[in-house]
């Protein structure tokens, strides 16, 4: 059963149809990528799934519930987590204060907040950084904190916006391992990133979008060997 589905999504700006009847799906314990050249409509599609941009037509279903008109906050309450491309941590706060800032928005007891805090710190291997100020963290530590914050609401689904952007190769590898671990725990994951190799190396499937439509979908091998994908996006010399 699919956890997230979009059905015939349409988004127009003036006379320009940026997304043109686009349908994608992501199941539980599955990592799916959205790829495509600049202006293809992939980011718009992703933001419609998140709830930042409203669709002009079509449907978005989460766990079989129609969420097309629901806000990003309502989607979060249903079990969707979102990791933005922009830095989302409070640099002047400690690691545990950053996590507690979100925990305090939940309707749970102080004891449960403390338990959840300790559990999250341990799960993402940042317990030793609990009292460190966020501005002192390395790139890898900061990305772990950002992912931890996205997990505070205990989501069943994560939307990751450019998770490999602006970080060193060693940090990319760490982020990939975290994402694969989340998949192993049963989360469905939709990610979009301009780093094609890094994305295809961990996705079960990917959609390549061009001119607001799906050009091809399938495994990394399917995309790499597709003539149209090479012509429009990957190039003839692309190799994993």
Describe the function of each predicted region.
Residues 133-137, 141:
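Conserved ABC ATPase signature
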Residues 158-162:
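Catalytic Walker B motif of ABC-type/P-loop ATPase nucleotide-binding domains
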Residues 93-100:
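Short coil-to-helix segment of the ABC ATPase nucleotide-binding domain corresponding to the Q-loop/switch region
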Residues 154:
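Conserved catalytic motifs of ABC-family nucleotide-binding domains
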Residues 100, 111-129, 176-180:
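Conserved ABC ATPase "signature" region
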Residues 35-37:
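The feature captures the beta-strand-to-loop junction immediately N-terminal to the Walker
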Residues 58-65, 78, 116:
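Conserved ABC transporter NBD signature motif
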